[in-house]
Amino acid sequence: MYNQEVKLTTKEILEKEFKTSMRGYSQDEVDKFLDVVIQDYEVFQKKIERLEQEIHQLRTEAKRAASERQTRHQTSPSVGSTNYDILQRLSNLEKKVFGNKLYE
């Protein structure tokens, strides 16, 4: 997971003032570059928010699936014994209705 803190916000980048000197950088060029950086920051922030929502949703789904799996696992033995009981009853009824002809 990404543990480093973001040092700048889009607002801080936008409001940053640079000192000018005799042979300094072109102010327009710096402003254009910072505009690009701000746009990238906004895109990254939106991606981070979307991915955090997706992580939350997937974790919720995983918990629900695990809970359903556990519930199914707990009820499956009783279903198996119920099926066995039904088959045993059916066998007894067949013996009574058809006699021992089926089992000869």
Curated annotation (Swiss-Prot):
Q: Which organism is it from?
A: Halalkalibacterium halodurans (strain ATCC BAA-125 / DSM 18197 / FERM 7344 / JCM 9153 / C-125) (Bacillus halodurans)
Claim: Cell cycle is one of the keywords in the record: yes
Q: Tell me how this protein assembles.
A: Forms polymers through the coiled coil domains. Interacts with PBP1, MreC and EzrA.
What is the name listed in the Swiss-Prot or TrEMBL entry for this protein? Answer: Cell cycle protein GpsB
Q: What does this protein do?
A: Divisome component that associates with the complex late in its assembly, after the Z-ring is formed, and is dependent on DivIC and PBP2B for its recruitment to the divisome. Together with EzrA, is a key component of the system that regulates PBP1 localization during cell cycle progression. Its main role could be the removal of PBP1 from the cell pole after pole maturation is completed. Also contributes to the recruitment of PBP1 to the division complex. Not essential for septum formation.
Localization per record: Cytoplasm
Q: Which GO biological process entries does UniProt record here? A: cell division; regulation of cell shape
A Pfam family of this chain: DivIVA
By sequence similarity, the record places it as follows: Belongs to the GpsB family.
- Sequence segments annotated as region (Disordered): 60-82
Coiled-coil stretches are 34-72
Query: Spans of biased composition, class Basic and acidic residues?
Result: 60-71
Bias type Polar residues, positions: 73-82
Q: Alphabetically list the UniProt keywords.
A: Cell cycle, Cell division, Cell shape, Coiled coil, Cytoplasm
Gene Ontology CC terms, in alphabetical order = cytoplasm
The record's annotation in HAMAP family points to: GpsB
